[in-house]
UniProtKB/Swiss-Prot annotation:
It is an enzyme of class 1 (oxidoreductase). NCBIfam families: hemA. This is Glutamyl-tRNA reductase. The gene is hemA. PROSITE patterns: GLUTR. One of its GO terms (molecular function) is NADP binding.
């Protein structure tokens, strides 16, 4: 009863290789249903994101190994000779479970603690469940992974603290001003970085966001998406600097777009009410001399990266707690797997003893009285339970490092001459 995981991720393969292995939702469904319908797997699921494509399989044949699955997906995607087995990782049994628990907990992510991955794991399971390729094992594995991720999020700080420049900027603004809903924000630049910063601001309850961009249509599109519908002409935004508590700049330029003199004038109009400028440009958008203006807080990318590094360091310090949670859940999952493995043997063992008992009782059915027969049945039941107690207890006991469940099952089946079980997995 094995579970195999095989795949490529940011640790094992460069992006050009990962791109050639990735699966769309349609391809995902075709792949997993193909594995099951061909009798290659009892169960199958694929997790495919920008950073990883991972296959989770309960094999239906002894020939289905990690190497087999690597070759299978390379062929399925027609990935070419450049994609080789060494670009893949392989995990088996509890190693597969540990890997999925680590992925779901965001400690195997490109950015430690990046919380988006859990939603992607849930989506992978949804697809497999929808096409009915997630059976009892993968269903239990995934739901345990979801539980692990929830415990990690609530019991540790692995996901706390900004680890992107745009989010770090917003987090810093919130620390300075506390309630962003009461502040007026100017976003200069509606490119990818500016858009992310605006969306993070909106998520932190900032609603009074004004956008300016060289191309007005981009300003209007972002403002409409946020629901603010507030834009300023790029040519005249400097005339309004004094109106804003928070200014975020994210434009591509070789010249400073805000000078010390401009901010000094703006601060006089504000009567020195504090302003924070978050310069997300590279090269910098704001003259560093602006920081000399009274009540002006200027933070550029280097300052924000220092915050990010500190946050990542704190997240790394939470790893022992995360691993402890994973270890705890891994033991519970392993014990559940073991109960599935031993259940047929326990049933067969009990059935064999009941059959022996009934045959022996039948031999005396017409030789003794009904009362004596009842006593014999009662006595043989007690003897049978005492004989079976130890082997059943041994089968149910936790696995030690020097033991294995298959060896226990084989031992009991051989000693008591039980036929090989007919199992679906």
């Amino acid at each position: 009863m094995n579970i195999i995981s095989v795949g490529v991720n940011h640790k094992t393969a460069p992006i050009e290789i990962r791109e050639r292995i990735s699966l769309s939702e349609v391809q995902n469904k075709e792949f997993v249903t193909g594995l099951v319908s061909a009798g290659i797997a009892h169960e199958a699921m694929v997790l495919s994101t920008c950073n990883r494509t991972e296959i989770y399989v309960v094999p239906a044949m002894h020939e289905v190994t990690g190497e087999y699955l690597k070759d299978y997906i390379i062929s399925f995607r027609e990935a070419g000779k450049d994609v080789r087995p060494e670009h893949f990782f392989s995990r088996f049994y509890c190693g597969t479970a540990r890997h999925l628990f680590e992925v779901s907990s965001a400690i195997d992510s490109l950015i430690l603690g990046e919380g988006q991955i859990l939603g992607q794991v849930k989506e992978a399971y949804r697809i497999a469940a929808e096409v009915q390729t997630a059976g009892i094992l993968l269903t239990r594995l995934c739901h345990t992974a979801f539980s692990v991720a929830k415990k990690v999020k609530t019991r540790t700080k692995i996901m706390e603290g900004a680890v992107s420049v745009s989010y770090a900027a917003v987090e810093l603004a919130q620390k300075i001003f506390s309630n962003l809903s009461m502040k007026k924000v100017l976003l200069v630049g509606a490119g990818e970085t500016g858009e992310l910063a605006a969306k993070h601001m909106f998520a932190k309850n900032a609603r009074n966001i004004v956008i300016t961009n060289r191309t007005r249509s981009k300003s209007e599109a972002l403002a409409e998406e946020l629901g603010t519908n507030q834009v300023l002409p790029y040519e005249s935004y400097k005339e309004h600097l004094h109106e804003f508590d928070i200014i975020i700049t994210a434009v591509s330029t070789k010249e400073y777009i805000i000078s010390e003199a401009e901010m000094h004038a703006a601060m006089l109009k504000r009567r020195l009410k504090p302003v924070i400028i978050l310069d997300l440009g590279l090269p910098r958008n704001v003259d560093p001399e602006v920081s000399k203006v009274q009540n002006m807080f200027l933070k550029d990318i280097d300052a924000l990266k220092h915050i990010i590094d500190k946050n990542l360091e704190r997240r790394s310090g939470e790893l022992p707690k995360v691993h402890a949670i994973i270890d705890e859940e891994l033991v519970a999952f392993g014990q559940w797997i073991n109960t599935l493995k031993v259940r047929p043997t326990i049933v067969d063992l009990q059935s064999k003893f009941i059959e022996i008992k009934e045959k022996e009782i039948e031999r005396y059915r017409h030789k003794v009285s009904e009362e004596e027969l009842r006593r014999m049945e009662h006595l043989t039941d007690r003897i049978m339970k005492k004989i079976l107690h130890h082997p059943i207890k041994m089968l149910k006991a936790p696995i030690s490092t020097s033991d294995s469940m298959p060896s226990r099952v084989d031992l009991v089946r051989n000693v008591f001459d039980l036929e090989e079980p007919n199992q679906s997995h």
